[in-house]
């Protein structure tokens, strides 16, 4: 099962938390569609800002959005002008008060989405897919990853018949729930058609906290 299921969803509730943190009864469908609109709007608006993850929290009529990015300066802008403009646009989109928090990704080479985006952009620039994948894997391993696996699917190098190729280095234990596996899927729009890029990165293990032992032992 660990080989088939999405590694991110497989670990939610174990070592990962939800990207959407809110509760709704009758308004669940409306909030879900609003979340999708928010994510699509931010990803389109900040497509060059290396945005990896968007967390959404709701409290009454307020929406708190945390944007994880490797380029916080590009998102914030000069004097905070860009992020303020983004906040106003999201206020108009949702009809609610929006608060935006920018979270910097200090090691982008350990983020599966950013690594996949980098490979996809190189393929769009007609760089050989094997070279792009292997260079990305080397940078990730140098950044401190325990393992990485990449896969490209489609008309690779313009071949008439679509195929898939994958490369891996180190350990990527997909079925080990305590393993911090980051997974992402990206697309490269090439002249030969679309090529899918999948990336798995093992960032080590997250061990559960041990229960505290009682300081007072048995007595009378």
UniProtKB/Swiss-Prot annotation:
Q: Which domain of life is it from?
A: Bacteria
Identify the GO cellular component terms for this protein: cytosolic small ribosomal subunit
Q: Which UniProt keywords apply?
A: Ribonucleoprotein, Ribosomal protein, RNA-binding, rRNA-binding
Q: Check the record and name the PROSITE patterns matching this protein.
A: KH_TYPE_2 (PS50823), RIBOSOMAL_S3 (PS00548)
Tell me which Gene3D superfamilies the record gives: 3.30.300.20, Ribosomal protein S3, C-terminal domain
Q: Where is the signal peptide?
A: none
User: Which InterPro entries does the record cross-reference, listed alphabetically?
Assistant: KH_dom, KH_dom-like_a/b, KH_dom_type_2, KH_sf_prok-type, Ribosomal_S3_C_sf, Ribosomal_uS3_bac-typ, Ribosomal_uS3_C, Ribosomal_uS3_CS
Q: Which Pfam families does the record cross-reference, listed alphabetically?
A: KH_2, Ribosomal_S3_C
Task: Give an example GO biological process.
Answer: translation
In what residue span(s) does the KH type-2 domain sit?
38-106
GO function terms (MF aspect):
mRNA binding; rRNA binding; structural constituent of ribosome
- In the UniProt record, does the keyword rRNA-binding occur? yes
What quaternary structure, including any partners, is listed in this protein's UniProt entry?
Part of the 30S ribosomal subunit. Forms a tight complex with proteins S10 and S14.
Q: Which PANTHER family match?
A: 30S/40S RIBOSOMAL PROTEIN S3, SMALL RIBOSOMAL SUBUNIT PROTEIN US3C
Give the record's family classification: Belongs to the universal ribosomal protein uS3 family.
Function, please?
Answer: Binds the lower part of the 30S subunit head. Binds mRNA in the 70S ribosome, positioning it for translation.
Kindly provide the name given to this protein in its UniProt entry: Small ribosomal subunit protein uS3
Give the organism, scientific name.
Answer: Lacticaseibacillus paracasei (strain ATCC 334 / BCRC 17002 / CCUG 31169 / CIP 107868 / KCTC 3260 / NRRL B-441) (Lactobacillus paracasei)
Query: What gene codes for this chain?
Result: rpsC
């Amino acid at each position: 099962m660990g080989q088939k299921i999405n590694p991110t969803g497989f670990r939610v509730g174990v070592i990962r938390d939800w990207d959407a943190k809110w509760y709704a009864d009758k308004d669940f469908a409306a909030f879900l569609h609003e979340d999708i609109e928010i994510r699509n709007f931010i990803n389109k608006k900040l497509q060059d800002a290396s945005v990896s993850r968007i967390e959404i929290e709701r409290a009454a009529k307020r929406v708190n959005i945390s944007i994880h990015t490797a380029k916080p300066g590009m998102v914030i802008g000069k004097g905070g002008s860009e992020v303020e403009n983004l906040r106003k646009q999201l206020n108009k989109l949702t009809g609610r008060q929006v608060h935006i928090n920018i979270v910097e990704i200090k090691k982008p080479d350990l983020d599966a989405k950013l690594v996949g985006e980098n490979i996809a952009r190189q393929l769009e620039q007609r760089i050989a897919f094997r070279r792009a994948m292997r260079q990305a894997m080397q940078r990730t391993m140098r950044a401190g990853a325990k393992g990485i696996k990449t896969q490209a699917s489609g008309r690779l190098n313009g071949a008439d018949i679509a195929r898939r190729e994958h490369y891996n280095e180190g350990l990527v234990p997909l079925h080990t729930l305590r393993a911090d596996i980051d997974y992402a899927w990206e697309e490269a729009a090439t002249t030969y058609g679309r090529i899918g890029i999948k990336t798995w990165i093992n960032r080590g293990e997250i061990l559960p906290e041990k229960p505290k032992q009682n300081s007072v032992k048995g007595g009378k």
